[in-house]
Design a protein with these regions (language model features):
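N-terminal leader/targeting and accessory segments in enzymes
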Residues: 1-98
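Walker A (P-loop) phosphate-binding motif
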Residues: 95-108
Length: 108
């Protein structure tokens, strides 16, 4: 994975994804519509830029800063990120896609 990865949704899964990406030396942009204290502390600990509550019109610019996007569970299908990612041709993954990518076990 190269470039910057935008992680949307910084609950338990999103924070774990950010941590895993940072451990693999991937640049991360964390985004949450309503980040809590724990999400802010995690972003600070990982030295990840955190964007809080972006307006709907901000998504094309945010997605344009990323080479890929990882969405946490619970992000609704109608979230403006999806339209922005499609328009920009940016791949959207979830945590299981990311895990499969990193799984180096032999395949049958």
């Amino acid at each position: 994975m190269s470039g910057r990865v935008l992680v949307l949704g910084l609950g338990v899964t999103g924070r774990a994804v950010m941590d895993a990406l940072v451990r693999r030396d991937v640049e991360v942009l964390g985004v949450d519509d309503r980040p809590g204290v724990v999400a802010r502390a995690c972003a600070e600990r990982l030295a990840v830029e955190l964007v809080e509550a972006p307006a709907p019109g901000d998504w094309p610019r945010l997605v344009g800063r990323a080479t890929e996007v990882v969405v946490a569970p619970g992000i609704p299908d109608g979230h403006p990120l999806f339209a922005a990612a499609e328009a920009a041709g940016v791949l959207v993954l979830d945590e299981s896609d990311l895990a499969a990518r990193w799984d180096d076990r032999p395949r049958c």
